[in-house]
Each structure stands twice: as structure tokens, then as C-alpha cells.
Amino acid sequence: KYTDVQMLLQEPQLGTGHAVQIFQKKNKLDNNSKLIVLYGDNPLIDLHDLKNMNAQLAKKDIVIMGFKPKINTGYGIVVENKGKVSRIVEFKDASAILKKIKTCNSGIMAFSSKALKLITQIKNNNAKKEFYLTDIVKLSKKYNHKIKLINAKDVKTALGINDMYELGVAETIMQNQLRKKAMKGGVQMIAPETVFLSKDTTFGKNVKIEPYVVIASKVKIGNDVVIHSFSHIEGAVIKNKVSIGPYARIRPGTVLENNSKIGNFVETKNSIINKNSKINHLSYVGDTTIEEDVNVGAGTITCNYDGVKKNKTLIKKGSFIGSNSSLVAPVIVGKNSIIGAGSVITKDVPDNTLALTRAKQKKVKLNKKKK
């Protein structure tokens, strides 16, 4: 799937410099090569900063991305002498005086081909016996390499993640960014802080989202869509003038065509709900195609799994499914047909047909109980 990505295993893990050394052994770099080193625990990095670093490599040999947090919680310290970077000191190794320096090392660095040749000279002369990539700064001074320090556009973009709390902080920042982008693009959110989006979520015009909605990955939303409270959507295509929820679960493979409606406590999966069709209440629809102008009554279930495989249901145009019905797949309901309430349908229903499997109603007179 990611054919342009090369995966290398660092085993054992002997530091950031060691990781780059492994990369160098597997890849031949020419004199025009550039390398930007990023970290998996810096998810908020901004493309603007990376472009800036790349541009600086036209004049510099090493570019360091720094940032200035209000409180240094353990980041390496960038030491400068007369406006030039002289070294980077790990927080735990820094003196009390150095810890007063405001500029921290994000860990993100960019290298010219000239600087990359020094990677092999990094030693592990430290208490942890690790190869620190930051040691290349001190090495470069010996060769008069040009070093540039740039500060991140936003301090938040340089945040690293070391535990679940910091992951939660980063997720909050990311969600706020996604909400802002969506609302600036015209999406109305009643209580933005309760709406959760994915980075790949796309919106059309005039979309309204009520409180407590989760939109997971691979969701495309069209124009004039209303998503009511407590709905969860994942892997779905939502066309125009669609209403969802409240309390709806839209699972992967769902396509909601124009002017369709999914009501409260309805779950759909791998199904196409066509134009003007409605599933208003308390239903499960899986592996199903519902054609245009279909009404699915409350409590309808498509019984798609027989214990071995999933089977498909087709409900054709203009049909009406009565409440509390079970459609046992594979099954087809023909055009303009009616399924009587409370039916269990196990065989195909022809066009223009009423089908019902209700047991005959009996009346039994009750004897009065003695007091």
C-alpha cells in the first residue's frame, strides 16, 4: 500500500544517531542528498516548518528545529554562543545554569550531504551508551559546517509524546485544529468541543453537526447534511440533503444517497441507501441495497449472517417494510411491495405484492382471579 516507504528495524535501539546510521547503511546518498529526521512521537509537526528547513539547506549544512515552551519538561537544550549554535545538551545532563536557557530541541533536524558524512563519527561515550544524533552539532563545529537554528511556527507542533497523558494533550490540540478548519470552511457545530473528526474527513456546504458526534476515518460528507447528536460515522459516503441520527451508527461501506434519512438507534453497515429512502427508528441494515423511495419501519432487521458467511438483501424501489420485520438474507423484496408488520421474510417477494407471515391471532378468555 505504501510502496514509496521503506521500513527499517532498529534492533537493538541504541539512540537516534544509531537509527540514522542504520538508514545510511541501507541507502547510498550522493552529494546532492538532503535528509530531514522526524520522530514518530511528534504528530503535530507543521508542513510550513519542514518546507522552511528544506529551504535553509540551500545555504546551511545542518538545520535544527527549536522551540520555546513555557516550561521545559525534559527536552534537550540548544546552547548558543554569540548567536550561533554550539551544542545541544540533554536535559538530564544540563547544569542548573543551562536549564535556564529557553530554547529547546524538538529533535527534528535536517542535513546536507556534507553533514551526513559525519554520522558515522558519532560515538556512544555517555552513561546510556547510546549514539545521540545531537552530537553531530559538536562534530560539525570542527569542520566549520554552517548550522542554522529555526524556531517552530507554533510551540505545539514540536510537542513530543511519552505517555498517555501527553497523547491526550496532542489529540486535543489536533481535534481543535480540525474543528477550526471545518468551521472556517462553513461547517456549523453547536458544541464544537464535543465533536470529534478525522484528518481525512471532507465536508460539503451547509453541514450542521449537533453535540457529541464522532466522525472516524474515511468519511465524505456532501451538502446540506444534518448530523444529530450522539451519532458515530466511519468509512461512509454521505451525499446531499441527508439526515443522520440522533444515536445513529453508520459503519464502513455505507453510502447514503441524496435526501435519504437514518433515524435514531439505526445501524447500517456495507449498505447503500438510495434517494428518498428512510430508516427512521431502531433498525439494523447490513449488506443491503435499498433502492429509491423505500420506507423501512421501526424495528426492522436484515438478518445478513447465517453463522458462516454474510448474505445480501435487496429492497427494490417504492417498497414499504412494516415495523418489527426480519428479512432473512439472501432475499429480495420486489418493487412497490409491502411487508406486513411483524413478518419474518425468508423467500423473495415479487413486485407489487403484500407479504406477511404473522401467526394467527387467538383470543383466550381469562378467568377472574379470586381475591
Stretch-by-stretch model annotation:
Residues 4-6, 84, 146-148, 188:
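Conserved beta-strand segments of alpha/beta enzyme cores
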Residues 365-371:
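Adenosine-phosphate binding glycine-rich loop
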Residues 2-82, 110, 114-120:
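Conserved beta-loop-beta/alpha segment of the NTase-like Rossmann-fold superfamily
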Residues 10-11, 38-41, 66-69, 81-82, ...:
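Fold-independent oxyanion-binding glycine-rich loops
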Residues 32, 59-60, 144, 291, ...:
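A general structural motif
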Residues 66, 176-186:
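Conserved ATP-binding module of the ATP-grasp superfamily
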Residues 85-175, 180:
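Catalytic-core segments of class I nucleotidyltransferases/pyrophosphorylases
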Residues 188-356, 361-362:
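Structural signal for interior beta-strand "rungs" in well-ordered beta-sheet cores
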